[in-house]
A protein has these predicted regions:
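S-adenosyl-L-methionine
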Residues: 1-19, 24-32, 46-48, 55
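Conserved acidic residues
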Residues: 13, 183-184, 254
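Conserved SAM-binding motif I beta-strand of class I
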Residues: 36-40
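Short, conserved SAM-binding/catalytic segment
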Residues: 50-64, 155-164
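Glycine-rich active-site loop/strand segments that organize a redox cofactor
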Residues: 63-84
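SAM-dependent nucleic-acid methyltransferase catalytic core
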Residues: 78-79, 84-201, 212-230
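Conserved Class I SAM-dependent methyltransferase catalytic core
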Residues: 230-266
Length: 266
């Protein structure tokens, strides 16, 4: 991917990823030695940024982490909100895996709420669930017939952690851009069109918040998916150009890179 070659070419030692999503670009910047700030408004993005960007793999006890993952893997299933909502009222996961998600997620809050391991354990659980879901990749709908992988057993694995420090935040991109000091490299990957990440990945948002929201429709989306507060101006065709202009005028960077595609409104 060409973006990955920009940092060494421009001798950057720091970068800001304002719409980090699943943190893949931020991870690659960190892997190449940059100090990275990863930001997004989604809770699941913040958790992944805490796991991959803020956590320094060289400064943690990997033995303790592996032992904890092994213990969580041994927990029996305990059906709860996740099983009822995403396995019975909808068909994203097999009930056997939904029950284990419920059990593991409860224990993470009960036993690791203040632990340095929490974002790593949550990321591991999210990725484990992703490997046994029955979707095409986004969570706007589930498959009519079960995906083959959905029959596999849920398994927590150690995420691919990186050495070095970094930081994370969960802020509105424009507000954060106005406050940040000048940086060497700014990466911008905002929503392209009407498709909203909040609804595309509503299960991950619920799994990370663990707030048992009211759900609606066949897809069992969070009820707050209807709220204006969960909608981005980048998802609105008329408002998007002006918001993008405001952002570009607000950032302070030696180099700014914007990622878009041919399905975008700009």
């Amino acid at each position: 991917v060409p973006i990955y070659g920009l940092a060494p070419h421009h001798t950057a030692s720091e970068a800001v990823d304002l719409f980090t999503g699943t943190t893949r670009v931020a991870q690659e910047f960190k892997r190449r030695g940059l100090s990275v700030l990863a930001n997004d408004v989604a809770t699941y993005s913040e958790v992944m940024a805490d796991c991959y960007i803020r956590t320094d793999a060289s400064a943690i006890d990997l033995g303790e982490l592996r032992a904890t993952l092994a213990e969580l893997n041994q927990l029996p299933g305990k059906p709860g909100y996740f099983t009822r909502t995403f396995c019975e009222e909808s068909r994203y996961f097999q009930p056997k895996n939904g029950a284990r998600v419920d059990a593991i997620r409860d224990v993470i809050d009960e036993s690791y709420a203040d632990s340095w391991m929490r974002p790593i354990l949550l990321t591991s659980l999210m990725l484990a669930a992703d490997r046994v879901d029955s979707t095409t990749g986004v969570q706007m709908a589930y498959l009519k017939g079960w995906a083959a992988r959905a029959h596999n057993d849920l398994e927590l694995r150690l995420p691919d952690l990186l050495p070095g420090g970094g930081s994370s935040s969960r802020r509105d991109a424009l507000e954060l851009a106005r406050e940040l000091p000048r940086t060497q490299l700014m990466y911008l990957d905002p929503p392209y069109n009407q498709h909203r990440y909040f609804t595309n990945y509503h299960i991950w948002e619920t799994l990370m918040r663990w707030d048992a929201p009211e759900a609606y429709g066949l897809a069992c989306k969070r009820i707050d998916s209807r709220d204006a507060s969960t909608k981005s101006l980048y998802n609105m065709k008329r408002e998007m150009p002006a918001e993008m202009r405001r952002l570009l005028h607000s950032i302070k960077a030696d180099l700014a890179v914007v990622s878009y595609n041919n399905e975008s409104w700009i």
